[in-house]
């Protein structure tokens, strides 16, 4: 199962964890190399970082479809308004047998019919593009909902904090070969011994 990618991407410098959680060079390097591309740490602290799958195509497709569909819809509405709102001209002039056909009026009326047909076609194309836009948007939202999982709070805390042992919060880099921290004072050879005050006895 791939690790969840609900972690918000932030480009701010410095650690963004609570105080007392992570210490040492290793944790700060992990925070530094965690960029806004969706890089997340795996459950294994020693394993390589796992990149979150990026899906730019659904978002890009529905944005392009929405823009194109809106533009075509506006053009179609304008063409239909022109075709139906503008009154046609009379093609025949005269009465009875003396009927003269006005070619300009015929061309004008034919242009109005072409505007109506073009407006209908543009509206149909806009509807198809808007349907594709809605389809891609639903695919993107469903994929985000199905692949999103809650983060495990124990997976983020790679270093455990103990109240009695503060030197365990340090990174292994700051430890020598014997396992002792460089910043902690050396252990006393006498162990934890209590200091007693001895007073000399007075001669009576």
From Swiss-Prot:
Subcellular location(s) of the protein: Membrane
Chain residue ranges for the region called Disordered: 178-204
Sequence ranges of Polar residues compositional bias: 190-204
GO CC terms, sorted: neuron projection; neuronal cell body; plasma membrane; transport vesicle
InterPro entries: Neurensin
Purpose of the protein: May play a role in maintenance and/or transport of vesicles.
Similarity comment: family membership: Belongs to the VMP family.
Keywords, ordered alphabetically: Membrane, Transmembrane, Transmembrane helix
Organism (species): Homo sapiens (Human)
Principal location class: membrane
Biological process according to GO: nervous system development
Spans traversing the lipid bilayer: 66-86, 122-142
Protein's name according to its UniProt entry: Neurensin-2
One Pfam family per UniProt: Neurensin
Membrane topology: Multi-pass membrane protein
């Amino acid at each position: 199962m791939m690790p969840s990618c609900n972690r918000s991407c932030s480009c701010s410098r410095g650690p963004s964890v609570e105080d007392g959680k992570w210490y040492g060079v290793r944790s700060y390097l992990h925070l530094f190399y965690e960029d806004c591309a969706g890089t997340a740490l795996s459950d294994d602290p020693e394993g390589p970082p796992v990149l979150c799958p990026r899906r730019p195509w659904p978002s890009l497709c529905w944005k392009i479809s929405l823009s194109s569909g809106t533009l075509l819809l506006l053009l179609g509405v304008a063409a239909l308004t022109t075709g139906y709102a503008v009154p046609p001209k009379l093609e025949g002039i005269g009465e009875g047998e003396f009927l003269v056909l006005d070619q300009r009026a015929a061309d004008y009326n034919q242009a109005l019919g072409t505007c109506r047909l073009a407006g209908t076609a543009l509206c149909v194309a806009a509807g198809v593009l808007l349907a594709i836009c809605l389809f891609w948007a639903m695919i993107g939202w469903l994929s985000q909902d199905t692949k999103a999982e809650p983060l495990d709070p124990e997976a983020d805390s790679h270093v455990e904090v103990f109240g009695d042992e503060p030197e365990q919060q340090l990174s292994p880099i700051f430890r020598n070969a014997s396992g002792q921290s460089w910043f902690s004072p050396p252990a006393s050879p006498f162990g934890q011994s209590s200091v007693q005050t001895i007073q000399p006895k007075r001669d009576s």
